[in-house]
C-alpha cells in the first residue's frame, strides 16, 4: 500500500519528549531540542484496524542510535510492523508481575519484512543506520492504549543500542540475556488476531 505522506500532518516526537529514555546524560541535561521521528497515525482504516506510518531519520543521539520512545500495550493487544524503507531493530521486553524483566529479544528487519509484537511485551524500534531513514508501517486496533511510564521510570528499555553494540540498562534490577529472533518474510494475510 503506497501512501503519499506529503499532505499529511504527523505527530512529531522531539528530543524533549525522549529525555527520560536516553542513554546519553549530556543530551538529557542539555537545552537542545530537535525532531527525532514522525508518526502518521490512522492514514488508513480497514476491517476495524488502524494503519500508521512512522518515519525515523538516521541520527545518533550521542553514542546511541535513534529510537522510538518505547511503550507497553495495556491489556493483551498485539501489533504488526512492516519495514517499508531502510532497516529496523525491534527490541521487545516482557515484565513479570513484580515489574522485573523476564524476557528480552530483538528482531532485525529489512524492507518488506514484518514482526508481530506479542501480548504483554513492551517494544522500542531502533534505526541502526547512520545514513538511511527508517520508514515502517503498523496495523493495530484503534482500541489499543499504550503505557510509556515503565520506560520513563527506568530511563529506557532494558538494553540500549550504541555504536559499540548492545549495553544493559543498569536501572533495571535483573536483565535477562538478549536473544535474536527472525523477522517474518511477509505480512500475515489474516490480521483478525489484532482485534
Give each language-model segment a name.
Residues 108-129:
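Conserved metal-binding segment of the jelly-roll/cupin
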Residues 2-108, 127-195:
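Active-site region of the double-stranded beta-helix
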Amino acid at each position: 500500500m503506497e501512501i503519499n505522506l506529503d499532505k499529511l500532518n504527523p505527530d512529531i516526537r522531539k528530543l524533549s519528549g525522549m529525555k527520560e529514555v536516553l542513554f546519553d546524560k549530556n543530551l538529557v541535561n542539555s537545552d537542545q531540542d530537535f525532531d527525532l521521528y514522525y508518526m502518521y497515525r490512522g492514514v488508513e482504516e480497514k476491517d476495524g484496524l488502524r494503519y500508521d506510518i512512522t518515519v525515523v531519520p538516521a541520527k545518533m543521539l550521542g553514542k546511541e542510535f535513534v529510537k522510538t520512545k518505547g511503550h507497553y500495550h495495556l491489556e493483551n493487544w498485539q501489533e504488526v510492523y512492516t519495514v517499508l524503507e531502510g532497516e529496523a531493530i525491534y527490541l521487545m521486553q516482557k515484565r513479570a508481575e513484580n515489574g522485573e524483566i523476564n524476557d528480552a529479544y530483538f528482531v532485525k528487519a529489512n524492507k518488506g519484512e514484518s514482526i508481530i509484537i506479542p501480548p504483554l511485551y513492551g517494544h522500542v524500534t531502533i534505526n541502526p543506520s547512520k545514513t538511511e531513514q527508517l520508514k515502517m508501517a503498523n496495523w493495530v486496533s484503534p482500541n489499543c492504549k499504550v503505557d510509556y511510564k515503565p520506560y520513563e521510570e527506568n530511563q529506557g528499555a532494558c538494553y540500549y543500542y550504541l555504536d559499540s553494540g548492545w549495553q544493559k540498562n543498569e536501572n533495571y534490577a535483573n536483565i535477562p540475556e538478549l536473544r535474536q529472533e527472525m523477522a517474518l518474510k511477509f505480512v500475515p494475510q489474516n490480521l483478525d488476531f489484532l482485534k
